[in-house]
A protein has these predicted regions:
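Class I SAM-dependent methyltransferase SAM-binding "motif I" and its flanking Rossmann-like core
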Residues: 119-196
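N-terminal export signals
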Residues: 5-25
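Short, flexible loop segments at the rims of nucleotide/cofactor-binding pockets, characterized by
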Residues: 40-42, 92-97, 125-129, 189-190
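Portal/gating segments that form or line small-molecule/metal binding sites
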Residues: 69-125
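General beta-strand structural signal in soluble alpha/beta enzymes
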Residues: 38, 92-93, 117-118, 149-152, ...
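N-terminal secretory signal peptides
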Residues: 1-2
Length: 260
């Protein structure tokens, strides 16, 4: 058996073993409600507290996945600071790792928690790393098993089919993402002047599917692809559904409920 055959065989065997273990821990995919909580920007303490409530656990295990920020130390510090006032068990899983210092697989780590928060940063790089490492597949397993997923900016955009990103030089462009949530997404809708006009242009021209736009500090809770609740931590922050009707772009605003 050559090295490639050995690695493939080993990975397949480990995947089957871990799959059976984690299914017992979280229940079958058919029984779980799939949950995603997003924010246009600012996934801070109130959003983390709301995610903790969505898990249904008294002291849930919440994991921070800072791939998009290149495992930024300052982001990790902020994560622990934002979790401090809440009754949660916080942890971090870096993506820039080595086998010499990490003995647990992606499945063992990501499928053992109750919620996963993805950082902001470069969405394009995030998607490339996830696919190279197989993290995208594990996140889908987590979603199917009822582990609450979430994040803001790149951490909200990543769950949709596509959206607008500043991940490339010079200007905002389109990025293709995981596609757990149908349609497109625009974060930072009120915070960056080019976000709204570009989103309207792309949807109006048919280059991008209709979708959800979120101001900073505003967000949406989805169950099984359906928006269940609109929330915010700042009074002026709103959520919008942007679509094409009769050949023109229509922006429908929603007034979120405050969370604290």
């Amino acid at each position: 058996m050559n090295r490639r055959e050995f690695l493939t065989s080993t990975a397949t065997g480990v995947g089957v073993l871990l799959g059976s273990t984690t299914t017992r821990a979280h229940g079958s995919a058919a029984q779980a409600t799939r949950k995603i909580l997003i924010a246009g920007g600012g996934f801070n303490t109130p959003f983390i507290r709301y995610m903790a409530e969505l898990t249904g656990k008294t002291r849930p295990k919440l994991l921070y996945l800072p791939t998009a920020s290149a495992d930024s130390p300052s982001g990790i510090i902020s994560w622990y600071r934002n979790c401090a006032p809440i009754n949660v068990e916080p942890s971090v899983q870096e993506s820039f790792i080595a086998s010499s210092r990490q003995s647990r697989s992606w499945e063992e780590v990501l499928l053992s928690v109750d919620g996963i928060v993805c950082s902001g940063g470069n969405t394009l790089n995030q998607q490339a790393i996830w696919r190279a490492q197989g993290i995208d597949v594990v996140l889908k397993q987590a979603w199917d098993r009822g582990i609450v997923l979430g994040g803001a900016s790149a951490g909200s955009l990543c769950w949709f089919e596509e959206g607008t990103t500043d991940s490339r030089p010079k200007q905002l462009t389109i990025v293709k993402c995981l596609g757990f949530l149908e349609g497109s997404h625009s974060p930072h809708y009120d915070a960056e002047k080019n976000r709204r006009p570009l989103y309207h242009e792309l949807i109006g021209s048919g280059q991008m599917k209709p979708g959800w736009a979120c101001d900073n500090d505003a967000g949406i809770y989805f169950e099984d692809n359906e928006p269940k609740r609109f929330v915010h931590t700042r009074d002026a922050a709103k959520v919008y559904y942007v679509s094409l009707e009769g050949g023109r772009v229509v922006e429908k605003p929603y007034d979120p409920e405050r969370i604290a």
